UniProtKB/Swiss-Prot annotation:
Signal peptide: none annotated. ATP binds at residues 23-30. The keyword ATP-binding applies. Residues 2-469 form the UvrD-like helicase ATP-binding domain. Belongs to the helicase family. AddA subfamily. Heterodimer of AddA and AddB/RexB. Coiled coil: none annotated. It comes from Lactobacillus gasseri (strain ATCC 33323 / DSM 20243 / BCRC 14619 / CIP 102991 / JCM 1131 / KCTC 3163 / NCIMB 11718 / NCTC 13722 / AM63). InterPro entries: AddA, DNA_helicase_UvrD-like_C, DNA_helicase_UvrD/REP, P-loop_NTPase, PDDEXK-like_dom_sf, Restrct_endonuc-II-like, UvrD-like_ATP-bd. It comes from the Bacteria. This is ATP-dependent helicase/nuclease subunit A. The heterodimer acts as both an ATP-dependent DNA helicase and an ATP-dependent, dual-direction single-stranded exonuclease. Recognizes the chi site generating a DNA molecule suitable for the initiation of homologous recombination. The AddA nuclease domain is required for chi fragment generation; this subunit has the helicase and 3' -> 5' nuclease activities.
Length: 1204
């Protein structure tokens, strides 16, 4: 018989109250749920009178099986109990299901309440649902545009570019997903504009009083506390630091004034002025005569100063960029656009519903909306439905309660017995990781903080962890004590969230020490770019592989709970879990090279697979053969097997024009290659003709048949999965056309959107090898699972914050929808506030995701990361933990860039038995010190001796592993040091060009110009802002790029052009004083530019190009003479003269006037290679005219220099 803890016993037996069970990881919540159901049945409650809601269908199946097993076990004791026998039969038909399945049951039973045809079908294919939604969107677009609706046009213009309307469409589709999880989506939508209503006084508005003011007071209070902590240091009063203290006293008073003006509701512009006055006096320089203690405190004061200035800049940028009048204007304009969005969204929902009704379909969002309508619509029929379920269910048990959304919460409320406490909710807010499904952890937290304070509710905390060893439990607690707090995550982890060790069945001599393995990314030479926003380091995978091999070689022992014995480690005991699956393909490749078995439980990233890239390129080619990259990719693929030398022959014969032109020309050559080209073009033309008269799905299948593609990929490694992937694309094309869509280009665009949204189509292929293989999965997929050894990988990945800087933010709080009005180029106060809130919500969920990952380990936890400049990061982490409180300050947490920013501060602190915690790099030779390894984070005293005895052998093993890894010579090493694609900005670095115009230009503008109107007053903490030479050079290029040669030929014209660039948001107003207007005016008035004035239509600026270049021409010592690199770049300018093209490039390099001739020659040598590259590109782009002259425009020297 199971011995339950006191808290578990309460959760099983307590009744008469609404009960919330907060069940930490590994606390046996499923066992408790099953036992509670059994107790209900044994007390005479039929299982049919219970509603048990689970999060997944698999969980529902498991729940049913476990309940049936419990009843069967009881029947062994009471074989004559007929009631139990009837209950055993009833379990399969009992209401144990997901919320969607329950809602579907409501609809099938009471469809007539909402006038729904009972013969409806469920739209289970997500892709088909997306297609139908897309069709609804296109139809409302057409209705609006045909009606010449200017408000709608303004909305689309605000969020979309010149070429498409994807920005506005994405907004409407995302808003749909949020609105339809609300119990009253129309009310939710109608409330969206209200947060913009501020009248003529910001300070008196609800927005300011209820949202912005409390946030700012809290932030400034935190800054004040940091200042006060420094001023409380005894050493700050020393004679060495008198001026430092004076500086901080003055700053502290200014910060107090800002806080006081906020707190007392002074006018907005006065609050803004007080913020702008928050500055430090002149910097104090450090003296060598100071004591060591003074120097240490001085350095702390400098670090704090930088941090304070940084935080104040962010506050200014978010809430005080312009004065009150301008802020109100932005809010009013935004409000108008939001009202238009609301109207369009309602039409989209109505149109989508209409299309589904016409086909008698309902989708998953309909299930919950329809069920809620049936249960709450104010008609006699609705009351019948609601009363039916209220009478039917004596108790409602909800698993994973932390992941319910607002609509689901209201459905549950609607069926709860009136006036009775019949809710039993189990969950763990620390494991709420489904924000992308509109999960609402705040619903759990609301009950968590109120239940138990009256006689109608009860809160039970299950903290005992029966999964993990004491060391794993201690590691998790140590790491999360500083992270999860009441103001970050909503729970005080130290007081109420810690795991309590409960797995006393583990033997005491098991090897269980937690480990973390860091690689210094800066020193690694092979890296993959992943879709999560960072690089996935080769060495990170290699070190995981090395550690697995080491564990196997050491005959590492695991505890088998089934046999209650120790046994040697098997591969199936190991799980590698990651934040995303984007690196799966690379991990699989490395494991295959290492001959280690690996089973990927998640679907691969479908759109990254070789076969999908190949077929999509062929479809692009059929749609438009005048595309070089798809054309060459298809020709080089296994379908046609054109080799590099053959492609080179084709290009040499026709060096001008695109590659399709060259291919067509070569097809007439009487040779084996010419015949090959001709056959390729014939098949392409056949398929293009076929595409014009047949369905897309038929075209895809025709490609498979003509090229034998299915047979080809089946013969490759993992061939069956590749075949499934291709067949899946065919099925999606069929679904696409069934939904009423047509056109190959549109289908390609649709698939591209799915790729960008990472909506994988393929399903994982089950494998016989899964039984004894290392498991690779995402943290989301690992939830609810456990493994003896867990590697948590990719902890150095940068968080993806792109959505936070977008044109809109959607949330389910009071702000709802917040947008950026593009004509102002500043974020409205509402948008700035929403971004702050959204960032914290996102990072809170990332912290919870991390918690889920770390708590999967039973016996051993290994954390793995590749980190840039690891030593600098370690210094930063040391300063980010408040050691007295064991807390990472909130401001540090909401600025976290990666999981390591959460974990690092605690990992870097001294531990109780620090003498056993060593950098294992100390055992390595200097050349091998790529890896920073720390083991045994939580060693207990009795294990110190054993660990010291083993350390020499472990260090020797690590040394050997690292040497083997880095003595390996990759046969294509040269190719790993570059890519098949290079931008000119990268190549210019090889030519030592100090100005990366093509790349830096857009980055400079986007980061510095957040609004069109110039700020009249510069905040004092921004005064004296310095611009680099590259930034100034970029701005000079920008002026010349847009200069109008059709205007007046004078200095005033130049000033007007610069002012217009500032007004348009293309040039930072703070940059203008740094421009050399004399140099700019010299050039536009020079003899060289005189033809520009005469024929401005012949002048081409910022011309983009792509060119295939020999790699050996770009990179020294490149061993493969046949290797090619596709170069993409932008030419500053060229002029179409009568006899040919005049190519020119601006340079802002400093020219030494004392030795001008030699300095110019040096600059000329530096950039000759670059201009030759531009010359080659222009010659390939132009059939009629070739480059007849190349010139460097040296703005500093006021010289036009010809280049050979």
């Amino acid at each position: 018989m199971t011995n339950f803890t006191k808290e578990q016993d309460q959760a099983i037996n307590d009744a008469g109250k609404d009960i919330l069970v907060s069940a930490s990881a590994g606390s046996g919540k499923t066992t408790v749920l099953v036992e509670r159901v059994l107790k209900k049945i044994l007390s005479g409650t039929p299982v049919s009178s219970l509603l048990i809601i689970t999060f997944t269908k698999a969980a529902a199946r498991e729940m049913k099986e476990r309940i049936k097993q419990k009843i069967s076990d009881q029947l062994e004791i009471e074989p004559d109990n007929q009631f139990l026998r009837s209950q055993l039969l009833d379990v399969d038909t009992a209401n144990i299901s997901t919320i969607d399945s329950f809602c579907l049951d409501v609809i099938r039973r009471f469809y007539y309440v909402i006038d729904l045809d009972p013969q409806f079908s469920v739209l289970t294919d997500e892709t088909q649902a997306e297609l139908l939604k897309e069709r609804a969107l296109r139809e409302i677009e057409a209705d609006y545009l045909e009606g010449d609706n200017q408000d709608f046009q303004d909305f689309y213009d605000n969020f979309s570019g010149d070429r498409d309307a994807e920005g506005a469409r994405n907004l409407l589709l995302q808003l749909y997903n949020t609105a339809t999880t609300e119990p009253n989506y129309e009310k939710f939508l109608d409330n969206l504009p209200t947060c913009y209503e501020v009248g003529d006084n910001l300070i008196r508005s609800n927005l300011w009083q209820q949202q912005i003011k409390p946030l700012l007071l809290k932030e400034i209070s935190d800054l004040k506390a940091e200042v006060e902590a420094l001023l409380a240091e005894p050493e700050i009063n020393s004679s060495d630091l008198v001026k430092v203290k004076e500086n901080y006293d003055i700053f502290s008073n200014r910060l107090d004034s800002f806080w006081e003006s906020l707190n007392t509701d002074q006018p907005y512009n006065e609050i803004r002025a007080n913020l702008m006055n928050c500055k430090f006096e002149k910097a104090v320089r450090k003296s060598k005569k100071w004591s060591d203690e003074s120097i240490e405190v001085y350095q702390d004061s400098q670090d704090l100063k930088l941090d304070l200035n940084d935080q104040l800049k962010k506050i200014f940028a978010s809430f005080f960029v312009v004065e009150e009048k301008e802020q109100i204007a932005v809010l009013q304009k935004s409000e108008k656009i939001v009202k238009t969005i609301v109207a369009a969204e309602k039409k989209l929902i109505q149109k989508f519903s209409q299309l589904k009704r016409e086909q008698n379909l309902i989708d998953y969002s309909d299930m919950e909306q329809f069920a809620f309508s049936i249960l709450t619509t104010d008609t006699s029929n609705a009351h019948i439905a609601q009363e039916y379920y209220q009478e039917k269910f004596n108790e409602i048990l909800i698993d994973e309660y932390q992941d319910v959304n607002a609509l689901q919460e209201n459905i549950i409320k609607a069926i709860k017995k009136k006036g009775q406490n019949t809710l039993f909710m189990v969950g763990d807010v620390k494991q709420s990781i489904y924000g992308f499904r509109q999960a609402r952890p705040d619903l759990f937290l609301s009950k968590y903080h109120t239940y138990g304070k009256d006689n109608d509710s009860e809160k039970i905390i299950l903290a005992d962890n029966f999964r993990s060893t004491k060391r794993v439990t201690k590691t998790v607690n140590d790491l999360f004590n500083p992270i999860l707090t009441t103001n970050f995550g909503g729970i005080d982890y130290k007081k109420e969230g810690q795991l309590q060790f409960g797995a006393s069945y583990y033997p005491s001599d098991l090897p269980t020490a937690s480990e973390y393995i860091f690689t210094d990314k800066k020193q690694t030479q092979s890296a993959y770019e992943d879709q999560y926003g960072d690089e996935m380091d080769f060495s990170e995978v290699q070190m995981v592989i090395a550690r697995i091999k080491q564990l196997k070689a050491e005959n590492f022992q695991v505890w088998d709970r089934r046999t209650q014995l120790k046994r040697p480690l098997e591969y199936s005991d190991i799980a590698i879990i990651t934040r995303t699956r984007s690196d799966n393909l690379q991990v699989m490749q490395e494991f295959a090279k290492a001959d280690l078995p690996l089973f990927v439980t998640d679907a691969q990233n479908y759109f990254q697979t070789f076969e999908l890239i190949m077929i999509m390129n062929y479809l692009r080619l059929i749609d438009n053969p005048q595309q070089d990259i798809p054309l060459v990719a298809v020709m080089r693929s296994p379908l046609f097997n054109f080799k590099e030398p053959e492609l080179a022959q084709i290009r040499v014969k026709t060096p001008a024009g695109n590659f399709y032109t060259a291919l067509t020309s070569f097809a007439s050559v009487n040779s084996s290659l010419g015949k090959k080209c001709k056959e390729f073009l014939q098949q392409l033309e056949t398929l293009r003709s076929f595409a014009a008269t047949h369905r897309i799905s038929e075209l895809i299948w025709s490609i498979y048949e003509k090229t034998h593609l299915l047979e080809i990929v089946t013969g490759l490694p993992n061939g069956q999965q590749r075949r499934v992937n291709l067949e899946s694309l065919y099925e999606r094309a069929t679904s696409y056309e069934s939904a009423g869509f047509k056109g190959l280009y549109q289908f390609i665009s649709f698939i591209e959107r799915m790729r960008k949204n990472q909506k994988d189509l393929a399903q994982p292929l089950l494998s016989d090898k899964a039984d004894n293989a290392v498991k690779l999965m995402t943290i989301h997929a690992s939830k609810g699972l456990e493994f003896p050894i867990v590697f948590v990988m990719g902890l150095g990945h940068q968080y993806q914050t792109r959505d936070l800087s977008g044109n809109f933010t959607i949330s389910q709080n009071e702000l709802g929808l917040t947008i950026k009005e593009k004509n102002y180029r500043i974020d409205s106060l509402v948008k700035s506030l929403a971004d702050v809130q959204k960032r914290q919500q996102m990072l809170e969920e990332e912290a919870r995701i991390l918690y889920v990952g770390l708590t999967r380990a039973q016996q051993k936890l290994i954390l793995v990361a590749s980190v840039n400049e690891i030593e600098n990061k370690r210094k930063k982490w040391v300063s980010e933990l408040d050691q007295k409180k064991d807390i990472i300050p909130l401001v540090k947490k909401i600025n976290a860039q990666s999981p390591l920013d959460f974990l690092g501060p605690k990992l870097e602190q001294k531990h109780e038995f620090d003498q056993t915690i060593r950098d294992m790099t100390s055992a390595l030779e200097e050349q091998d010190k790529l890896y920073y390894l720390k083991f045994n984070l939580d060693l207990e005293p009795e294990k110190i001796k054993d660990q010291n005895e083993d350390s020499q052998e472990v260090n020797s093993n690590v040394n050997k592993v690292v040497k083997e890894l880095y003595n390996f010579k990759y046969p294509f090493e040269d190719a790993t040091k570059t890519t098949a694609y290079q931008s000119v900005s990268e190549i210019k670095k090889a030519f030592n060009d100090p100005i990366d115009t093509e790349l830096e230009n857009s980055r400079l503008i986007s980061s510095s110009n957040r609004y069109l109107q110039p700020i009249d007053e510069t905040p004092t903490f921004l005064e004296g802002q310095k611009f680099t030479g590259a930034e100034i050079g970029t701005a000079m290029h920008l002026v010349l790029q847009y200069y109008n040669y059709e205007g007046n030929k004078d200095q005033e014209n130049l000033d007007q052009e610069i002012d217009q660039l500032v007004e348009l948001g293309k040039l930072n107003s703070l940059m203008v004083p740094h421009l050399s207007k004399e140099a700019l005016n010299w050039f536009v008035m020079s003899d060289f530019a005189k033809e520009f004035w005469k024929q401005p239509d012949k002048l081409h600026r910022e011309s983009q190009f792509s060119s295939l270049v020999n790699a050996s021409e770009l990179f020294n010592d490149f061993s493969d003479p046949s290797a090619k690199v596709l170069v993409h770049g932008t030419v500053d300018g060229y002029f179409e003269a009568k006899d040919g093209l005049i190519l020119f490039d601006y340079k802002t390099d400093f020219v030494d006037k004392t030795n001008e001739e030699q300095a110019i020659e040096k600059i000329k040598q530096k950039y000759t290679g670059q201009l030759r590259l531009y010359e080659q590109a222009l010659n390939e782009m132009n059939n009629d005219k070739k480059v007849i002259g190349k010139y460097l425009i040296l703005l500093d020297a006021r010289k036009v220099v010809p280049v050979d």
